[in-house]
Amino acid sequence: LKTIVLGPPGTGKTTTLLNEVDKYLKQTDPDKIGYFSFTQKAAYEARDRAMSKFNLSEDDLPYFRTLHSLAFRRLGIKKDEVMQRRHYEDLGKKMGLIVDYHEYDNEHSGLFTTKSDLLRIVQIAKLRGITPEQQYNLKEHTQDITVHQLKQFVHDLDQYKKDYNLIDFTDMITEFIKADRSPRFDVVFIDEAQDLSQTQWGMAKSIWDKTQDTFIAGDDDQAIFRWAGADVDSFISQTGKIMQLTQSYRIPQVVHDVASRIVNKIQNRLPKEWRPKTQRGLLSYYDDFEQVNMKQGNWLVLARTKFMLNDLEDTLYSQGLYYQNKFKTNREQDLYTAVNDWENLRKGVDISYEQISRIASYMSEKHFEKNCLKYMDKDARHTMQSLRERMWLKTNDVWYNAFDNAPQKKVRYIRRMRENGEKLNSTPRITLSTIHGVKGGEQDNVVLLTDLSRNTQRNYEQNPDDENRLFYVGATRAKNHLHVIRPKDIYKGYKI
C-alpha cells in the first residue's frame, strides 16, 4: 500500500512519520524499516529521534539514511572511488578550464553546486534523465558555451572517470537501479520527496517495488530546488492513499493569510487545506530594512540571493546588533573569545596556552612579549599574576585598551553590541540567510526581503511557480511576526 503524506509548513511531518515507524516496530525488526530523505540532516534527525523514542542504537537502524548513502553502501563503493573536488579541479587543469565543485553534503543539503556551467549542465541532465544537449537547449545556463565545448567536456569527463576508475554521486544512483540492489523492506518512508530528482524517483521506485508498504512524504508547495534538478511533477503525480496533515503548530493566523495568498498563485499543485495555530500573530510592512527594530528577540532575515545579504550586514554592524551570516564564518568570533578569556584572566581565572596566544595576537609588543610564547609550557595553566611576574604581560587594562593590535572597527562593533546588552557568549540572535538556505527552519521574527536580482526577475516572469513556492517557504518560517520589506523598485520584485 502506498500512502502520500502531505505536510504543509509546521504540521509535524517528521513526528507523524515516526509515529508510523512506531506502529511497524511493534511487529517488525528495525532493519526491515527503510527511512530515506533527501538531506543527511533530515535522515539523521529522524534516526536520532527514533533512537531516543524507541531506545535503539545507531546500529539498530541501518537504513535511516539518504538515498545516496544507501546506494554507496549497497554497491560496496569505497570513499576513494568517488569523484571529489580535487578530481574536478584536476580535470579542469588538464582541459585548461576552471571546474570547481562543492560537495553534495556541504551543509548536508543534498544539493550539488558548482560555478562551472559545463559541469552543471552535465549533472542536471543526469538528474533529470535527459542528455547534456537537451539540457543545453533549455538555456538555463548563463555562461557562453558552445555545443562543441560541451561535447568535448562530456567526453573528457567520461574518459577521466574511466582512467582513474571513479564514479560520481549520480552514477551511484543509476548503478543501484541497474544492479537492482535494494534490500527487501516491510515498510519504507521517503521524506522530503518533493526534492527528489527524476533519477532519485527511479531509485525510490526500485526500493518500493520490493516493499509491502510505502509512505511518501513532502509538500509540493515547498519544492524550491527545481533549478537543482528536483522533479516536483513526479511528486504531484504520485497515486495512493492521501494522508493530509491539517494543523500547523508553527504558523499564526496572519501569516497563514499571507501564505494562502501566495500559494493560490501556484498553477501546478496538489490542493490542501490546513489550519493555523490559535495565536493571531503579527504582520508588518516596511519600505526599508533599516526601519525594522531588531534590538530584541530572535530573528531570521531572508533575501532571495546571497549578495543581497552584504548590505544588510553593514546595517546590523553599524547598529551594533549581534548577527551571523549563514554563508560566512563569523568575523568576530575569535576576538569575542579573546575578550572573554581576558576578562576571566583579570578576574583571577587561570587560562591555557592556547587562550594566551589568542590574546597575544591582539596585542602589540608594548603589551605582550611575543617571544616568550616559544618557551611557555604548553600544558600549564597561567594566571594574570604569573604572567605579570615574568614580565611577559605588561598590561592589565580593560580589553579595548589592552588589545591595541585589534582592528578598531571590530573593537567598536563589540563595544557597541555590549552596550546594547547582546549576549556574545551564546549564538547570534539574528541569522541572515537566503530562503533556500533555511528550508525547514523557523523563527519568532522573520524579515522577508522581496527584491529580485535581474536573473531572478527574468525567471519569475518566465516561470512564476518557482518564485511563488520560494516566497511561500520564506513567509512560512515565521512563528509569530512576519516583517515584509517592499522592493526598492516598485516595478520589480515580488509582491506580497
Identify the residue ranges that each predicted region occupies.
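P-loop NTPase Walker
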Residues: L1-E81, S260, V473-T476
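Conserved helicase motor core of SF1/SF2 NTP-dependent helicases
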Residues: P8-T14, F38-K41, Q194-R280, L300-S318, ...
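A polyampholytic, Gly/Pro-enriched intrinsically disordered region
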Residues: K79-I98, I262-L270, A338-C372
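Conserved two-lobed SF2 helicase motor
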Residues: T66, D168-M172, P428-H436
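Conserved beta-strand -> loop -> alpha-helix junction used to position metal-binding or nucleic-acid-contacting
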Residues: E58-G76, L321-L345
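Conserved interdomain hinge at the start of the Helicase C-terminal
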Residues: S284-G297
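Conserved helicase C-terminal RecA-like lobe
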Residues: E343-I485
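Accessory N-terminal region flanking or inserted into the helicase ATPase core
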Residues: L1-G7, T16, K32, E103-F189, ...
